[in-house]
């Protein structure tokens, strides 16, 4: 994964480009999908900031509140089977993102909730095709 990280770092983007904060869900150590998402972001002209694996929700909220990102991409692998914890984290982060005009993307095959009217808005992507489509929509 270090080789992929070096590839990502080699892609130059404008300092004025939109910024995406990348992290895995609490309790999730799987970062390969997140590295691939970071590569996709760079290819679409986004700056990326790596929060890393198992970043606690309060730390992510502090970064959202500081104005340091336009998007938060949170990944959970299929092995992240604690659906209640993922739902709680998604709701908490969706509320913080909505309050600060940050787009939340929940990705991976973890047991994330589906977008619903009783939740603050977020995007749910299951694979890289859906992620590329989302990035293309956001560029327009």
Where are these regions (language model features)?
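Conserved binding/catalytic microenvironments
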Residues: 1-92
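Generic detector of intrinsically disordered, low-complexity, polar/charged segments
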Residues: 30, 104-105
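Short, well-ordered coil/turn elements that cap or connect secondary structure elements
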Residues: 43-45, 99, 119-120
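A short helix->loop->beta-strand "cap" motif at the edges of active sites that frequently abuts
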Residues: 98-104
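Peripheral docking tails and interdomain loops at the edges
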Residues: 105-140
């Amino acid at each position: 994964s270090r080789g992929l990280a070096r590839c990502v770092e080699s892609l130059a983007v404008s300092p004025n480009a939109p910024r995406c904060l990348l992290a895995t869900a609490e309790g999730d150590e799987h970062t390969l999908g997140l590295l691939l998402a970071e590569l996709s972001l760079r290819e679409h002209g986004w700056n990326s900031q790596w929060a890393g694996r198992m970043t606690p929700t309060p730390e992510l909220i502090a970064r959202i509140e500081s104005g340091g990102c336009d998007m938060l991409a949170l990944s959970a692998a299929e092995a992240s089977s604690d659906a209640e914890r993922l739902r709680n984290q998604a709701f908490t982060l969706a509320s913080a993102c909505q309050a600060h005009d940050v787009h939340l993307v929940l990705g991976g095959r973890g047991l994330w909730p589906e977008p619903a009217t009783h939740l603050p808005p977020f995007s749910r992507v299951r694979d890289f095709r859906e992620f590329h489509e989302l990035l293309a929509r956001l560029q327009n």
